[in-house]
């Protein structure tokens, strides 16, 4: 911070001290800027001039910082069309065109727009060179052309990285071919064509590095050094682009600048001229720099991995880390370890294989990688005097006595030190030790039914600190960060990290898939409000579309939620082990950092309450469909209670937890409160009661007792709601009427007036339908006060399919007939959730840890 302040003070002092009465920032129409002349911006920050490199006759027109310690051109007008000798000049001709001349001949036309107005060229203090059409009063009328629209290898604050949808114009950086050769090189830094909210570096047209997705004002790649940058993302109908401004703590609005070098690395160049890395390139064995980056002369090392599909690059010397999917081009296995290159100057005894890249010149770095990709390659060299072109040999080409070739720099491949092989042994050992250690700890935890201790956590963290990387199991486009807490949670869930196989394979696999936060964010358009389906005690629910086109519903645990890890694990473990056509399918989960999400199959018709309690939408539910929905719920509950490998009590059956697929088939959802019973266990007790008002059985509400008969009670309430088209608690505003729907139906049943409770939208035919009347009686049997009097779900099946010859027993007094429920003084009763019409395709219940 103090160093930046000192440099900023000196820089400002230099600007004002160096001002001259003779300098100008403007080139008028008809004037010429020649070698030895400069345009200097108003506050002496930037200058435009012709320049050349030492021992080169090629001259370039470029913009530089106008001070003694910030070297290097930030923009070059004619990078691919140098002027031979000192004959170059820049002018705005009589037609308003901006042209670079070689002598009297036109070399390069920067702006071809013709205008009859007064036109001037001005260098701004932002570093932008603008061709402006002026009004008669001297004010600017419009910008005809600007250098910011044609970046070279450097990005300044205010410049764009992206593209114009309508014109196809792209704003991107392109590396130099060499240190003294500014022609367009092999690396391009810009916006991804397919995923517009991320930046990529392309090498020879292939993805070399990616920034991660833009989300909540930042990039998802953690080890991206954005200190000093304030990035913004703009997306309109015509343009998509990134832009950044400078942070005041890092040099103010003009700094830092970003440059892509010849090896594909992004450099941050601060006010003091010091270069630091913005990102970590594909890992190499080398010296550790800021943010864990490794770099040294590339010819003296071999990348541990050079990939771009499921390619794993990061900031460690082992090559495991950030993952994304693109076409792959691995290095040959022989090149991964134990080789270096020795530089020698010698004639070549014979000609090698010369790469002829049409329309492109290969840099020395490109040639180096071409050699690495070929196990037969033992040497490489540039074919041109400027360091471009590529020639490789499969035998040693050096021959000091050869007279047929001139001496040139050749890089000979030799076996290097045993460092890489040593690291391979170390890494392999760690990969063996870490899983074994985790397995032992997991078995101990399971044996003693311990969910985790500080000792275990600290031990695992210590083990992790001794290793440089954890095994990076990738799921094609899905990935989870491998922190200790996440791994322990996944172990508890019984989930192993693995590749996401083909779709058919996944459908046959009952285990959960693991999704990365990045993939879920991308699927939901970064949790946009447009994809939000609803919100409840668990948190918001979003609709998403996976990369393979599958639609999903995503429950995202809110940090402010009263629910927590217990409910998350409960639902994830239960649904993963339960498979039935009338149970909602859980596809996977996301456990990354503080994020916990559940990913379900998407239910396009939302939930039952969405239709049932709306006066217009309920018309869709005729009696045939309502009965089919009840059948499906019965089959789902029967499976949970009797036929699944686990005996499960749901404890929160209600209309909002019945989801409807595209064919209106019901699926039971929300297993956060569910409990598993042993084979010989019939009931259980809890001291913390939570649920939905109107659906809880009296023994559960008053005493905390629950069993399969608790679900039967809830189902009975739901049956009455389906038949009557009203909520159970819809009577509570009527002080003189019945307490709830149960009491209302019971009173009319005793008076033989049960037809009056049937939903009028079902029509007259339903009123006389004996099946409807039978279902009313079955529902009353399910909501009886005494749990022992209620039928089992297996009994319910036989009851609803019976006919007049199979008489039903008369129901006894229903629950809560004697007044509102009162809890026991020993019970801790949480405020019940009031039932609302749900807009969710996945529902949420307020729950408390048990």
UniProtKB/Swiss-Prot annotation:
The active site is at residue 652. Glycans are attached at residues 55, 118, 194, 374. Gene3D superfamilies: Bulb-type lectin domain (2.90.10.10), Phosphorylase Kinase, domain 1 (3.30.200.20), Transferase(Phosphotransferase) domain 1 (1.10.510.10). It catalyses: L-seryl-[protein] + ATP = O-phospho-L-seryl-[protein] + ADP + H(+); L-threonyl-[protein] + ATP = O-phospho-L-threonyl-[protein] + ADP + H(+). One of its GO terms (biological process) is innate immune response. InterPro entries: Bulb-type_lectin_dom, Bulb-type_lectin_dom_sf, Kinase-like_dom_sf, Pan_app, Prot_kinase_dom, Ser-Thr/Tyr_kinase_cat_dom, Ser/Thr_kinase_AS, SRK-like_kinase. Residues 23-423 are extracellular. It holds the Pfam family B_lectin. ATP binds at residues 533-541, 555. The keyword ATP-binding applies. Mostly expressed in leaves, and, to a lower extent, in roots and flowers. Keywords: ATP-binding, Cell membrane, Disulfide bond, Glycoprotein, Kinase, Lectin, Membrane, Nucleotide-binding, Phosphoprotein, Receptor, Serine/threonine-protein kinase, Signal, Transferase, Transmembrane, Transmembrane helix. It is an enzyme of class 2 (transferase). Residues 527-816 form the Protein kinase domain. Its main location: membrane. The keyword Lipid biosynthesis does not apply. Residues 445-850 are cytoplasmic. The chain crosses the membrane at residues 424-444. Residues 24-144 form the Bulb-type lectin domain. Belongs to the protein kinase superfamily. Ser/Thr protein kinase family. This is G-type lectin S-receptor-like serine/threonine-protein kinase CES101. It comes from Arabidopsis thaliana (Mouse-ear cress). The gene is CES101.
């Amino acid at each position: 911070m103090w160093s930046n302040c000192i440099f900023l003070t000196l820089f400002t002092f230099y600007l004002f001290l160096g001002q001259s009465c003779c300098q100008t920032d403007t080139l008028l129409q008809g004037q010429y800027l020649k070698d030895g002349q400069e345009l200097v911006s108003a506050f002496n920050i930037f200058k435009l001039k012709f320049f050349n490199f030492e021992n080169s006759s090629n001259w370039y027109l470029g913009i530089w910082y106008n001070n003694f310690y910030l070297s290097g051109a930030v923009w070059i007008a004619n990078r691919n069309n140098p002027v031979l000798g000192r004959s170059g000049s820049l002018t705005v001709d009589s037609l308003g065109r901006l042209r670079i001349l070689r002598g009297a001949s036109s070399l390069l036309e920067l702006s071809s727009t013709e205008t009859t107005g007064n036109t001037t060229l001005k260098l701004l203090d932002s570093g932008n060179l603008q061709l402006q059409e002026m009004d008669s009063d001297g004010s600017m009328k419009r910008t005809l052309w600007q250098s910011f629209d044609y970046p070279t290898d450097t990005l300044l604050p205010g410049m764009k990285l992206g593209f114009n949808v309508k014109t196809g114009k792209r704003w991107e950086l392109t590396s130099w071919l060499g240190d003294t050769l500014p022609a367009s090189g092999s690396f391009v830094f810009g916006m991804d064509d397919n995923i517009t909210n991320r930046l990529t570096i392309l090498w020879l047209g292939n993805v070399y590095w990616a920034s991660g997705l833009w989300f909540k004002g930042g990039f998802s790649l953690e080890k991206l050094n954005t200190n000093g940058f304030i990035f913004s993302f703009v997306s309109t109908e015509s343009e998509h682009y990134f832009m950044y401004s400078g942070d005041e703590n890092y040099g103010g609005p003009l700094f830092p600048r970003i440059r892509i070098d010849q090896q594909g690395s992004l450099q941050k160049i601060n006010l003091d001229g010091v270069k630091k890395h913005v990102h970590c390139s594909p890992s190499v064995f080398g010296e550790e720099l800021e943010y864990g980056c490794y770099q040294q002369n590339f010819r003296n090392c071999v990348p541990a991995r050079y990939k771009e599909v499921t390619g794993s690059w990061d900031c460690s010397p082992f090559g495991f880390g950030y993952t994304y999917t693109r076409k792959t081009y691995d290095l040959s296995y022989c090149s991964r370890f134990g080789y270096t290159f020795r530089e020698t100057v010698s004639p070549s005894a014979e000609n090698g294989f010369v790469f002829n890249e049409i329309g492109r010149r290969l840099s020395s770095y490109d040639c180096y990688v071409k050699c690495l990709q070929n196990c037969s390659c033992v040497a490489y060299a540039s074919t041109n005097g400027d360091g471009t072109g590529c020639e490789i040999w499969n035998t040693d080409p050096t021959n000091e006595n050869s007279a047929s070739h001139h001496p040139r720099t050749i890089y000979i491949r030799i076996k290097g030190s045993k460092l890489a092989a040593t690291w391979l042994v170390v890494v392999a050992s760690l990969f063996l030790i870490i899983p074994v250690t985790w397995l032992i700890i997991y078995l101990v935890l399971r044996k003693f039914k311990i969910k985790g201790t500080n000792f275990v956590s600290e031990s695992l963290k210590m083990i992790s600190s001794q290793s440089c990387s954890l095994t990076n199991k990738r799921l094609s486009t899905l990935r989870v960060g491998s922190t200790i807490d996440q791994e322990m949670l996944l172990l508890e869930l019984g989930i192993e990290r693995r590749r996401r196989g083909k779709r058919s394979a996944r459908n046959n696999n009952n285990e959960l898939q693991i999704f990365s936060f990045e993939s879920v964010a991308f699927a939901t358009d970064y949790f946009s409000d447009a994809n939000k389906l609803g919100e409840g005690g668990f948190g918001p629910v979003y609709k998403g579309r996976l990369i393979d086109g599958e639609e999903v519903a995503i429950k995202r645990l809110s940090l402010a939620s009263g629910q927590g890890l217990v409910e998350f694990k409960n639902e994830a473990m239960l649904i993963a082990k339960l498979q039935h056509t009338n149970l909602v399918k859980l596809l996977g989960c996301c456990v990354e950092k503080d994020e916990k999400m559940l990913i379900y199959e998407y239910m396009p018709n939302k939930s039952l309450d969405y239709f049932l309690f709306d006066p217009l939408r309920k018309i869709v539910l005729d009696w045939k469909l309502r009965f089919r929905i009840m059948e499906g719920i019965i089959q789902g509950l029967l499976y949970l209670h009797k036929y699944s490998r686990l005996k499960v009590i749901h404890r929160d059956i209600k209309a909002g937890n019945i989801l409807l697929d595209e064919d209106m088939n019901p699926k039971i959802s929300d297993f956060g409160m569910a409990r598993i019973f042993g084979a010989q266990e019939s009931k259980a007790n809890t001291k913390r009661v939570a649920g939905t008002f109107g659906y809880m059985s009296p023994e559960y509400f008053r005493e905390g007792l629950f069993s399969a008969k608790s679900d039967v009670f809830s189902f009975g309430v739901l049956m009455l709601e389906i038949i009557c088209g009203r909520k159970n608690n819809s009577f509570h505003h009527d002080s003189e009427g019945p307490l709830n729907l149960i009491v209302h139906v019971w009173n009319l049943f005793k008076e033989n007036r049960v037809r009056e409770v049937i939903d009028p939208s079902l029509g007259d035919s339903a009123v006389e339908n004996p099946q409807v009347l039978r279902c009313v009686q079955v529902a009353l049997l399910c909501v009886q006060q005494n749990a022992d009097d209620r039928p089992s779900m297996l009994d319910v099946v036989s009851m609803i399919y019976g006919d007049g010859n199979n008489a039903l027993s008369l129901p006894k007094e229903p629950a809560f007939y004697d007044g509102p429920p009162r809890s026991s003084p020993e019970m801790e009763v949480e405020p019940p959730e009031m039932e609302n019409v749900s807009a969710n395709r996945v529902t949420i219940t307020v729950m408390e840890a048990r």
